[in-house]
Amino acid sequence: MTREIFDKIAPGWYNFRHWSIFRNELDGLAERWSQGSLLNVGCGHGPDFLQFKDNFRLYGIDFSRVMLEYARKYSGKFGFSPVLVQCDIRNLPFADSAFDYAIAVATYHHIKDKAERLTALLELKRVLKPGGEAFITLWNRWQPRFFFSGNEPVVPWRIRDEVVYRYYYLFSYRRAEKLVKQAGFRLIKSFPESSYHYPVKCFSRNICLLVRRPNSDKLSS
């Protein structure tokens, strides 16, 4: 997955996904967390900020320059002013323990290398304050759409006469939970998106994780 691909899809994505598909989850988190500093990891054009715009100090990062341009447009439209930074999520330009909370919606499953996925989550833990919480979503390997696709599909996106392909690493609940624990987070809960209404969670489209950096955590862990 390259910056160029996300730069290309940014205009269409701005119109296609103008509202977060996790509005219910983010509403609950805004109430749970109440106020503080919040980092949006892989913020794209910014719809996942909306639930936090009134009571939080907002920061957003993305490696796509064009996505961040649309995030400025989006935040201006809805009357909030996040600090937006272009960077690599594997090397965050923030001090240790800088943020009270974080969200990362549909971000880490775009990282192809296993070690780099862990590195990115270790960076997230580093910039969270001890006791700080993060909400992470990942695509589920066992959603019906990908039953026969393997763990690493490429998903097409059409831009006029061009088709670009987005890489995904698909997680099972077990793999997702193992990864965040390996990064040193405490898993509070894992659950499907609110629009999924079946009794067995393992076939949901998304895996949602609420995690916490332990109060006694050491950055070297």
Task: List PLM regions with ranges.
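A short glycine-rich, Lys/Arg-flanked "PGG" loop and its adjoining helix->strand segment in the class I
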Residues: 118-130
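A short acidic, Gly/Pro-enriched loop at the edge of an enzyme's catalytic core
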Residues: 90-102
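Class I (Rossmann-like) S-adenosyl-L-methionine-dependent methyltransferase catalytic domain
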Residues: 1-35, 39, 44-91, 115, ...
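Active-site phosphate/pyrophosphate-handling residues
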Residues: 4, 106, 119
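A short SAM/SAH-binding and catalytic strip from SAM-dependent methyltransferases
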Residues: 101-115
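Short, amphipathic alpha-helix enriched in basic
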Residues: 73-76, 100, 104
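Active-site acidic-Proline motif in GNAT/NAT acetyltransferases
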Residues: 65, 96, 109, 113
